[in-house]
């Protein structure tokens, strides 16, 4: 952890190692620890206290006792000034504690730091008391990347007379280089083996993060007869659901009942019910809205004129703005005709061609049949049906006698049994022409009802004979 003094001036610090455990060398670890105060290289107030830490003895010739040094005297030993160009300059203060300077047991920690030296800050954060264990944490902060100012290091770097904090800084520098090289090697190995797999978001699609490296498709479908391979685990999982027909996400709307493999597809489908269209065309004077980003992308090709989907059939060369249009077009080259006319049975490769055929032929035939039926329906609604010998109807079941005769209602049997006509008689609204009824010779039938009797002759005339 960083002390409060370091947090007060973050602009002076560049973290050298982030919470990295750096074990000290065996040459720096002594069996006996020395009790001195922590030395802060940043000026702080008088009230601040530095925690007491256990430091190893610098040399084996030192005694096993140490004198406690007041922290305020050490804090005044350095003054740090930040220049206008961001460079740091250090100057020793004129006033120094005589007790600190006159102590023979205390190591000369700041003896090698001169005002002209462009050295870097050394920030020691000792989480436990003492440096005798390799598990103790050291956090080093260095604000300069230029090593040209380290001229105070003597050629005999392994000499025990070098201050201990300089040896610790050297160990930290070497450890950082080794850790950086190890991390770079690990990243290179990961990218080459294709282990850096990123999963997509809710629809199962990976996020677009620039050009992807060429990775081997290791995920192979285990279903018999399917040889598809995948890179992304989300795609592979979605593909396996298509084999199992695992449509576990069902639309809750009443009367819909559609099901989907993934939840994202269901969410997109729900926009068709609630009318939500969040994707708007940005072109001027257009403003069309769409439920999905894919539909908007396909629509924008109308404005740009882009047709990226090209038919690869020999001699075709047609291109389309949408992949679905290309897929429909490929049926033409395959010779398959799945769309059949329900009236005449003719088949077509495209549903649009079938619809054009039905509007052109079958609707005209229906209109012509209705026009032929209208003139023939007029005599049915006009005069009596008995005046036409060739016209009979199932609706003619009863007829009333004249009121002047005072007779009752005369119920006639079905005219089909009387005239011998089959069931293929014309009803009102039938498209068949009325002239298609065959002319059948009828016999005389006498019917009596009360005081009157009627006769149906061959000629179809109705005669009345009083009794």
Swiss-Prot record:
SMART domains, per database record: ZnF_C2H2
Residues bound to Zn(2+) 4: 311, 316, 329, 333
Domain of life: Eukaryota
Cysteine disulfide links: none
Record-listed Zn(2+) 2 binding positions: 251, 256, 269, 273
Binding site for Zn(2+) 5: 341, 344, 357, 361
Keyword Iron tagged: no
Chain sites annotated for binding Zn(2+) 3: 281, 286, 299, 303
GO molecular function per UniProt: DNA-binding transcription factor activity; RNA polymerase II cis-regulatory region sequence-specific DNA binding; transcription coregulator activity; zinc ion binding
Keywords, ordered alphabetically: Activator, Chromosome, DNA-binding, Glycoprotein, Metal-binding, Nucleus, Repeat, Transcription, Transcription regulation, Ubl conjugation, Zinc, Zinc-finger
UniProt KW Membrane keyword: no
GO biological process: negative regulation of gene expression; positive regulation of transcription by RNA polymerase II; regulation of transcription by RNA polymerase II
GO CC terms: chromosome; nucleus
Main location: nucleus
Chain ranges of zinc fingers (C2H2-type): 219-243, 249-273, 279-303, 309-333, 339-362
Residue stretches in coiled coil: none
UniProt-annotated location(s): Nucleus; Chromosome
Post-translational modification: O-glycosylated. O-GlcNAcylation may occur in response to increasing glucose levels and affect transcription factor activity.
Residues that hold Zn(2+) 1 according to the record: 221, 226, 239, 243
Subunit structure and binding partners: Interacts with CDKN2A/p14ARF.
Function statement: Transcription factor that binds to the sequence motif 5'-CATCCCATAATA-3', and is specifically required to silence expression of fetal hemoglobin in adult erythroid cells. Prevents expression of fetal hemoglobin genes HBG1 and HBG2 through CHD4: acts as a direct transcriptional activator of CHD4, a central component of the NuRD complex that represses transcription of fetal hemoglobin genes HBG1 and HBG2 in erythroid cells. May also activate transcription of matrix-remodeling genes such as MMP1 during fibroblast senescence.
The record's note on its domains: The five zinc finger domains are necessary and sufficient to bind to DNA.
Name under which the protein is recorded: Zinc finger protein 410
Native species: Bos taurus (Bovine)
Lineage of producing organism: Eukaryota, Metazoa, Chordata, Craniata, Vertebrata
Gene that this polypeptide is encoded by: ZNF410
């Amino acid at each position: 952890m960083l002390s409060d003094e370091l947090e007060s001036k973050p602009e002076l610090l560049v973290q050298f190692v982030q919470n990295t455990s750096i074990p000290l060398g065996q040459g720096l670890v002594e069996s006996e620890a020395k009790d001195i105060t922590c030395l802060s290289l940043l000026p702080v107030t008088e009230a601040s206290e530095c925690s007491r830490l256990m430091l190893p003895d610098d040399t084996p010739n030192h005694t096993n006792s140490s004198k406690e040094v007041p922290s305020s005297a050490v804090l005044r030993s350095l003054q740090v000034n930040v220049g206008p160009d961001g460079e740091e300059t250090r100057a020793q203060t004129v006033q120094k504690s005589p007790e600190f300077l006159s102590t023979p047991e205390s190591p000369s920690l700041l003896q090698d730091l001169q005002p002209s030296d462009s050295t870097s800050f050394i920030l020691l954060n000792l989480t436990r008391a003492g440096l005798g264990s390799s598990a103790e944490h050291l956090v080093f902060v260095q604000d300069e990347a230029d090593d040209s100012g380290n001229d105070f290091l003597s050629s005999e770097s392994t000499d025990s007379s070098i201050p201990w904090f300089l040896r610790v800084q050297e160990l930290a520098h070497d450890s950082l280089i080794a850790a950086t090289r190890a991390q770079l090697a690990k990243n290179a190995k990961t990218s080459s083996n294709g282990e850096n797999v990123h999963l997509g978001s809710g629809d199962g699609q990976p996020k677009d993060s620039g050009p992807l490296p060429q990775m081997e498709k290791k995920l192979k479908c285990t279903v018999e007869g399917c040889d598809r391979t995948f890179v992304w685990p989300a795609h592979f999982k979605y593909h396996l659901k298509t084999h199992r027909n695992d449509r576990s996400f069902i639309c809750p709307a009443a009367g819909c009942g559609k099901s989907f493999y993934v939840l994202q597809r269901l969410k997109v489908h729900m926009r068709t019910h609630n009318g939500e269209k969040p994707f708007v065309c940005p072109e001027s004077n257009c403003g069309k809205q769409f439920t999905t980003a894919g539909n908007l992308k396909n629509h924008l090709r109308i404005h740009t004129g882009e047709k990226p989907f090209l038919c690869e059939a020999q001699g075709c060369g047609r291109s389309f703005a949408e992949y679905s249009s290309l897929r429909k077009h490929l049926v033409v080259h395959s010779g398959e005709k799945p769309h059949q006319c329900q009236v005449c049975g003719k088949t077509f490769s495209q549903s649009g061609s079938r619809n054009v055929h039905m509007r052109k032929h079958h609707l005209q035939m229906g209109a012509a049949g209705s026009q032929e039926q209208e003139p023939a329906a007029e005599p049915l609604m006009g005069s009596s049906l008995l005046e036409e010998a060739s016209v009979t109807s199932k609706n003619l079941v009863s007829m009333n006698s004249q009121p002047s005769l005072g007779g009752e209602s005369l119920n006639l049997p079905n005219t089909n049994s009387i005239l011998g006509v089959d069931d293929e008689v014309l009803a009102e609204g039938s498209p068949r022409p009325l002239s298609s009824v065959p002319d059948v010779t009828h016999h005389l039938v006498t019917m009596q009802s009360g005081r009157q009797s009627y006769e149906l002759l061959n000629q179809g005339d109705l005669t009345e004979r009083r009794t």
